[in-house]
Amino acid sequence: FSSAKDPVNIAGFVAENILRNRIKMFNWEKAASLDNENILLDVRTPEEFRKGNIDGAINIPIDELRSRMNELPRNKTIYVYCQIGLRGYLASRILLQSGFDNVFNLSGGYRLWDACSKEKQETVVQSRTLIA
């Protein structure tokens, strides 16, 4: 037996999701282009949220999700994320099992979004420097 975040367990979650299509995923680029017609839900702790989050996200920690589900509109698409993906996966499953239809989980979580969006910003700055 190993921890929940062990790479073997994560690989198992990914494989099960692919085989059974349990959770729809979205990537970090999509997270940057969401509009007000969608809900971006951060299920990390308030402390993690304060340290950094995706613009426009609302924070409902996974431990509070069941008791605060009434704060989420059922007629909008909900894009869920956590730090690396596990809590987002679990939150997505909770929402789907509670009758929410359009739920997506961020592949790689906030950590990947943060790394990729910073890398993209640095590339744009470098490109502008080269052009000037």
Language-model features, listed with the residues they occupy:
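Rhodanese-like catalytic fold shared by cysteine-dependent sulfurtransferases
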Residues: 1-39, 46-79, 83-132
